[in-house]
């Protein structure tokens, strides 16, 4: 199944992640801590924790940091008690934005998120205002040149819902969030290495931004991204140019 080009956006996103590795480590420590607190410190029995630990390995985080975060979450070490909050809002031209946060101070966080939206041309929405435009799912991206037929066979057999190829040959695999680890293991066993593998909120439709609107939308996303309490940002805006 063909789709529009996403490969350049994936490469751009990976580049931005590399630039912000220190911030990514901080976010992963929070995620590991909360995952261990919610589901226990056994990686094999806690899919959310396993995903966070896998991300930490991909980000080259030292194992000692991972171990300490698990211990803090499971009660072995003292640590901050983080609360998970999701904010919804609108960007340029009404683009939908979800902002997932982990915070020890809800009042501070909501003020910072609201300020970022207002300063850069967006506005905060109410709960449920844009969340319905996204689907919770596992998402994998594979580089152009990957054997599409073999990947599709392995993915669908493992429980994937959909496999699409964009105009540059990049391949996206979508699966239910609870099947993410099983699909990842099956694809790895079949010899496929994903460029990105995450559980995400995927927009049902996307809006392409170019020119001045693209610049404005990127500034808003950057402002949100730079907030210490923000863990993940999801949007239906595709920035081009």
UniProtKB/Swiss-Prot annotation:
Annotated S-S bridges: none
Predominant subcellular localization, coarse grouping: cytoplasm
MF annotations from Gene Ontology: DNA binding
UniProt entry keywords in alphabetical sequence: Cytoplasm, DNA-binding, Transcription, Transcription regulation
Cell compartments where the protein resides: Cytoplasm
Annotated GO CC locations: cytosol
Top-level taxon in the UniProt lineage: Bacteria
Keyword Transport applies: no
Keyword Transcription regulation found: yes
TM region positions: none
Example GO BP: regulation of DNA-templated transcription
Family classification: Belongs to the TACO1 family.
Protein name (database record): Probable transcriptional regulatory protein mma_0544
């Amino acid at each position: 199944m063909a789709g529009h080009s996403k490969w350049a956006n994936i490469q751009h996103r990976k580049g931005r992640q590399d630039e912000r590795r220190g911030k990514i480590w901080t976010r992963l420590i929070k995620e590991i801590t909360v995952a261990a607190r919610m589901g226990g410190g056994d990686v094999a029995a806690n899919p959310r924790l396993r995903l966070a630990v896998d991300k930490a390995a991909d980000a080259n985080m030292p194992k000692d940091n991972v171990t300490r975060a698990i211990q803090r979450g499971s009660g072995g070490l003292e640590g901050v008690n983080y609360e998970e909050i999701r904010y919804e809002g609108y960007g340029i031209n009404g683009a939908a934005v979800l902002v997932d946060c982990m915070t020890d101070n809800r009042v501070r966080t909501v003020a910072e998120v609201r300020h970022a939206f207002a300063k850069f041309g967006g506005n905060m929405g109410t709960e449920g205002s844009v969340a319905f435009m996204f689907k919770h799912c596992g998402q994998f991206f594979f580089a152009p040149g990957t054997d599409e037929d073999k990947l599709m066979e392995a993915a669908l057999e493992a429980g994937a819902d959909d496999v699409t190829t964009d105009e540059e040959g990049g391949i996206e695999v979508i699966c239910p969030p609870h099947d993410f680890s099983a699909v990842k293991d099956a694809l790895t066993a079949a010899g496929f290495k994903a460029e990105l593998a995450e559980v995400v909120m995927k927009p049902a439709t996307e809006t392409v931004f170019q020119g001045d609107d693209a610049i404005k939308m990127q500034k808003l996303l950057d402002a949100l991204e730079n907030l210490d309490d923000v863990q993940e940002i999801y949007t239906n805006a595709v920035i081009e140019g």
